[in-house]
Curated annotation (Swiss-Prot):
Its main location: cytoplasm. It comes from Pongo abelii (Sumatran orangutan). Pfam families: SRP14 (PF02290). The gene is SRP14. Heterodimer with SRP9; binds RNA as heterodimer. Component of a signal recognition particle (SRP) complex that consists of a 7SL RNA molecule of 300 nucleotides and six protein subunits: SRP72, SRP68, SRP54, SRP19, SRP14 and SRP9. The modification Phosphotyrosine is found at residue 27. GO terms for cellular component: signal recognition particle, endoplasmic reticulum targeting. This is Signal recognition particle 14 kDa protein.
Length: 136
């Protein structure tokens, strides 16, 4: 994985979007980063380790090429503006998903059709009971 500066990351991310425009996907992850390069031991925290400031780790991949950058809290506003403009410019090829309302409607119609004979039988039983009590 290649760790890039913020501006280089945005440039490479634009290239990834252009490469995957016709077919393929770009996966982007964002998480808090405290500067550790080694995993946290199971027993607890490492003595003497104090993170200087909060940072964000951004990673992007198309399945073959991986890029990443670390953004400090001081430059996060500037980076987010550039990042949001890049996303707006390159996410024009999104397709609207077919919602699953069609399957819900068919299931609801099937349930109503199954319930209709039962409701008719209940109504007939009620009518017969009413007629029997009226005849007595």
């Amino acid at each position: 994985m290649v760790l890039l500066e913020s501006e280089q990351f945005l440039t490479e991310l634009t290239r990834l979007f252009q490469k995957c425009r016709t077919s393929g996907s770009v996966y982007i992850t964002l998480k808090k980063y405290d500067g550790r390069t080694k995993p946290i031991p199971k027993k607890g925290t490492v003595e003497g380790f104090e993170p200087a400031d909060n940072k964000c780790l951004l990673r992007a991949t198309d399945g073959k090429k991986k890029i990443s950058t670390v953004v400090s809290s001081k430059e996060v506003n500037k980076f987010q503006m550039a990042y949001s403009n890049l996303l707006r410019a390159n996410m024009d090829g999104l397709k609207k998903r077919d919602k699953k309302n069609k399957t819900k409607k068919t299931k609801a119609a099937a349930a109503a059709a199954a319930a209709a004979p039962a409701a008719a039988a209940t109504a007939a039983t009620t009518a017969a009971t009413t007629a029997a009590t009226a005849a007595q």
